[in-house]
Swiss-Prot record:
This is MSDIN-like toxin proprotein 2. Signal peptide: none annotated. Belongs to the MSDIN fungal toxin family. Keywords: Toxin. Processed by the macrocyclase-peptidase enzyme POPB to yield a toxic cyclic decapeptide. POPB first removes 10 residues from the N-terminus. Conformational trapping of the remaining peptide forces the enzyme to release this intermediate rather than proceed to macrocyclization. The enzyme rebinds the remaining peptide in a different conformation and catalyzes macrocyclization of the N-terminal 10 residues. The keyword Hydrolase does not apply. NCBIfam families: amanitin. There is a cross-link at F11-P20 (Cyclopeptide (Phe-Pro)). Residues 1-10, 21-34 form a propeptide. Probable toxin that belongs to the MSDIN-like toxin family responsible for a large number of food poisoning cases and deaths. GO terms for molecular function: toxin activity.
């Protein structure tokens, strides 16, 4: 796992708060991380 993914975790915890479409982004990021 990369530090970038860890740094973005806080934002992913609140997808409806500011990033409603983050669901698709996190899946792509995790796929790249793995």
């Amino acid at each position: 796992m990369s530090d970038i993914n860890t740094a973005r975790l806080p934002f992913y915890q609140f997808p409806d708060f500011k990033y409603p479409c983050v669901g698709d982004d996190i899946e792509m990021v995790l796929a790249r991380g793995e």
